Amino acid sequence: MRNPPPALAPTRRTLFASALGAGGWIGLSLAGRAAAQTAPAAASPAPAGGREPLFEISLAQWSLHKLLYGGELDALDFPRFTRETFGLGEVEYVNSFFKDHGADFTYLADLRQRCADHGIRSGLIMIDGEGNLGAADPRERRKACERHFRWISAAAFLGCRAIRVNAAGTGTPEEHSQQAAESLHALAEVAQDFGQFVLVENHGGRSSDGSWLAETIRRADHPRVGTLPDFGNFQIEAGVWYDRYLGVEQLMPFAQAVSAKSHDFDAEGNETGTDFRRMLRIVLDAGYRGPIGIEYEGSRLPEVEGVRATQRLLERLREELAAAR
C-alpha cells in the first residue's frame, strides 16, 4: 500500500495541527526532534569474557504495575528502581503510568534526567487507551492517530526508538486489516520525522493471530512500521488460542523489540507456560539481536521476585545459547 486512501492521507502536518494547534505542533516537534538527536546513551555492563551478548535485557514497566498502581513506586522512580534493584540498563514505559504527562516536557525532562543519572536507556513507550487504529469509521481512526502523536514526540524526547501501539478495530478480518494498515502508515509518516518506529504487539483479538498481524504489517508498507512479538499474548478470544511459537515466528521478520512474557516458574527456574529456550531460538534464528524485555504478569511470586526469576532465566539461556553457536 504505497499511498493510503484520502481519508488518512493528510497525516503529517495537517493532523498534527488539528490535534495540537499550531503552537503545540511547533513545541512538540522542536522538543522531540532535538531530544532525538541528543538523548543520552546508557552505559551497558561489559559482557562476560569480552564477548558481545546475544541480546540485552530490558524491563517493561508493566512488570511492576501493582507497585505503581498501589502507590509503592512512583513512575519517575522507575529508572532508578530498575538500575538499583535489577542492574538492568534499559526500560520500556507504559503510557498509563504517566498519561497526563505525554506533552508535559517538564515532567518528561525530569524522567529523562533520572534515566541519565542512573545510566538507563529508554527503549520505547507502550501506548494504550488512545483509540482504535483499526476502527471502521475513518473519523474515529483519524482521531486515534491524532491521540498517538504526542507519544511519538514524547518517545523521541526521552531517547526511545519506538512506540508500541495496538491494532484493535472492527469489520471483517480483511476490512479490519486494511483499516489498521492505513492508520499505521499514517502514524509512521509522522514517526519517521522523529526517528521512531511504530510497533504493533500481539495484544488480544485479531492481533493475536500471527498470520493476520503479519499481513497487516505488510499492508502498512512502511519501513517504520514493525512488530513487538510477545511470547504469551496469543489469546484471540475466550478459549481460542493461536500457537505462540508459530505466531512469534511469523512476527519476527518485522520485529524491532521482543517481549518475554512470564507468569510462573518451576523448581528448575523454567517458565511453566512457555518454553523460553524454544522461543529464544526462534528470535535469534530470525537474526534479531536487539533487547528482549522482561514482562512479568504472574500472581504467585511478588513482582520483584517474578522479574528476578525471568531475568535469571533469560541470562542462563543467553549463556547456554551463546555457547552452542
Residue ranges and their predicted role:
Residues 2-87, 207-325:
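Histidine-acidic metal/acid-base catalytic patches
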Residues 19-30, 42-52, 80, 114-229, ...:
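Active-site acidic/histidine proton-transfer and metal-coordination neighborhood
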Residues 89, 121, 161, 289-290:
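Short acidic/polar active-site loop segments enriched in Thr and Asp
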Residues 90-92, 124, 164, 259, ...:
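Conserved beta-strand positions in the central sheet of alpha/beta enzyme cores
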Residues 92-111, 170-171:
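Glycine-rich, proline-tolerant flexible connector loops at the mouths of alpha/beta enzymes
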Residues 92-93, 198-203, 267:
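Short catalytic-loop micro-motif centered on adjacent basic/acidic residues
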Residues 101-109, 138, 175, 303-306:
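Metal-dependent catalytic neighborhoods of phosphoester/phosphodiester hydrolases
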Residues 107-117, 183-187, 247, 279-282:
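Catalytic-core regions built around general acid/base machinery
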